[in-house]
Design a protein with these regions (language model features):
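Solvent-exposed, polar/charged alpha-helical surfaces in well-ordered, non-transmembrane soluble domains
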Residues: 36-40, 49, 53, 84, ...
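Solvent-exposed loop/turn segments at secondary-structure junctions
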Residues: 60-63, 82-85, 137-142
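Substrate-binding/active-site groove segments that recognize
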Residues: 70-93, 108-114
């Protein structure tokens, strides 16, 4: 029994967020409630569902009613500007930003935006850190941090250029969570 407990503690620490991991073990339904929807929406946008779930984990801890400090809404903390771009691009009439509190709408808008960012950085050998920085801080800042270099820049070099500590931590925490999901083989 002690070995089992030690194993759980080890996995919790390894996750990068032991408190969250313990909560996930104690209440798996809360943390898996949107997995099916994440799989569907991620597939529509050719993204790994584990990456999308890692973004949801970081942005809202799976709270579809979360309000951000700058007006972000829902599971993926989508901004009104990004949501309006998504609605316009997808010809969604009568879109209202409060619809972002609907998990499906939020995941569709957020995943669309993330996919667009990944596509923007597809020439990089690992576009994910670049796309996450763009998702968090905007395209112009991510471009500046890449030094406007179209050639392949390492993720490590790029992250060193990120002069917003909160954005650097944001990217690193999502990548850590994404790798955690990959290591355990499930979301």
């Amino acid at each position: 029994m002690l070995a089992l407990a030690a194993g759980f503690v080890y996995l919790a620490v390894l996750s990068g967020d032991p408190v969250y991991t313990v909560y996930e073990w104690m209440s798996p339904a809360r943390f898996q409630r949107y997995d099916r929807l994440i799989h569907i929406v991620a597939a529509e946008h050719q993204l790994d569902p584990m990456l999308v779930k890692a973004v949801v984990w970081r942005e809202s801890r799976f709270d579809p009613e979360k309000h951000g400090s700058r007006g972000e809404r829902g599971l993926m903390q989508v901004t009104e500007k990004a949501a309006n771009e998504w609605a316009r691009e997808n010809k969604i009439a009568d879109f209202h930003p409060d619809q972002l509190f609907d998990p499906k709408t939020n995941l569709e808008a957020g995943t669309w935006y993330l996919h667009r960012a990944v596509e923007h950085w597809k020439l990089q050998s690992d576009p994910v850190p670049f796309a996450l920085a763009e998702y968090n801080a905007g395209a112009s800042r991510a471009q500046r941090w890449s030094k406007n270099d179209a050639t392949d820049t390492s993720a490590r070099t790029f992250l060193k250029n990120v002069d917003f500590p909160a954005t650097r931590k944001y990217v690193e925490s999502i990548i850590d969570r994404y790798e955690f999901y990959q290591r355990r083989g499930r979301m």
